[in-house]
């Protein structure tokens, strides 16, 4: 299972990063792939109740990659963390295959409550740079979260959300091809910028 997940992670990197040249280079140099591999080892030890060892491994991964993933987080194969520095994934988070996470993104909790307090990210979601997804809700399949957005409630499938707090600016047809390329991310970031400018104009008018 470990090696299957690793292969899926490498395939996800090749599919989503135009700078990726070959599998060997990705395996050797991509911090996101390294962080996910470390995490799966930590997750194994966490499941068999060796929690201190799991935390030590996760902290080593954080030191070497700049990506912090709690050893209890559930992450499927085929996830791509691009650039990765500053990414944080909390204890009860779940991330499904096809998800792309950019640098500085946080899958965090709210408050000090126990139990499910981090988000569930369904398949083929894009979480842009600096976005914060906070709480124990679900981000639906194929959703896009704009750069710097702060998401505090459930996101429907195929929705694009931007702003602080995040709001829906578009819901795509489920039959549309999900665009997780860099061009697609730029379009999402542009929507985020436009929404921010609109908010500033509204505040000035008030």
Where are these predicted regions, by residue range?
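Terminal amphipathic alpha-helical/low-complexity segments used for targeting or macromolecular assembly
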Residues: 1-65, 176-206
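Generic, ordered loop/turn and secondary-structure boundary motif
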Residues: 29, 34-37, 70, 108, ...
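Left-handed beta-helix
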Residues: 65, 70-71, 76-77, 82-91, ...
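C-terminal segments of enzyme domains that contribute to small-molecule binding surfaces
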Residues: 115-134, 138, 164-206
